[in-house]
Amino acid sequence: MKKLFLICAALMLSCAMGTAQNTKFGKPSQLDWSMVGWSEAPDAEAIVLCKTLNVEYELQSDFKSYDNSTSELSAESVAYGGAGINKFISEDKITMTYSVKMRTKILKDSGAKYANLDIVYYWEEKDRTHSDDISSLSIVVFDNSTGKVKKRKLNSSCWTEERLDANYMVRHIRVADVKAGDIIEYQYDLTSRRATFLYDWQVQEDIPVLYTKCEMNIPAFLTFNMSVPVHPFVKSKVEEASVTLPQEISDLQAPKKVKSNYYTIESRDMLPKALDLQRRQSETPAATVGGEGDFEALK
């Protein structure tokens, strides 16, 4: 009976981790520290405690969009342009920022490799007009082995750059001296000038993911072929919203807004890809959210 109680308690803990996950970064919670394994994936070497993505578009005040008849649309009426019109927009007046956050815990010493991170980004060899920018990159290792939490902030010495082809590069982040029990937090922004290209977002990983949330506020004149996974643990919705254009401080008029679609994709307690595929007997492919592209923001 005692053994049965312990098993039930472990299952209850796993459920609690999924429903009360700490989404604030900078200070792991007591629940994060108490996580020493997950009954649903007992062989897991590491676990993603929390992973979030927020995509926001920024339009300059003189941004212009055109419908397929090339007639100019004002900031007020652009929302009513034909759906999917993305060819006739002034791309130099629009940018988008991917704000990525992830917290991973190493469960076994053999899982230290999951502290590493690869960021693929667009960076042309010749014309860098539309190249991506990576900013606000922060990597912090939290160690609680002595009962007192110690923070270790990493700098640029822990990463290298590699060119993949004429258009893309990858930033390899390698975190050394990581052991079982350590928690690693990553945060960065990726600014893209390619408004009609949407990078993919991985809901599922090679290790368990307790909580992930993807939010995208996309102007309505841009329409992507969203591939939201059909999975019992994934919930998605889209709501009407808006993108506010910047204005001068002296401008007393109401700020101009462009109609947008606000997408939210959220999942809890996702099994590793291989284990999930095995249990579900190949009913559904590994979960991915994305548009036109093959980018894996986090690996």
Over which residues does each language-model region extend?
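Bacterial Sec-dependent N-terminal signal peptides
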Residues: M1-K24
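Beta-strand-rich, non-transmembrane domain signature
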Residues: Q21-K299
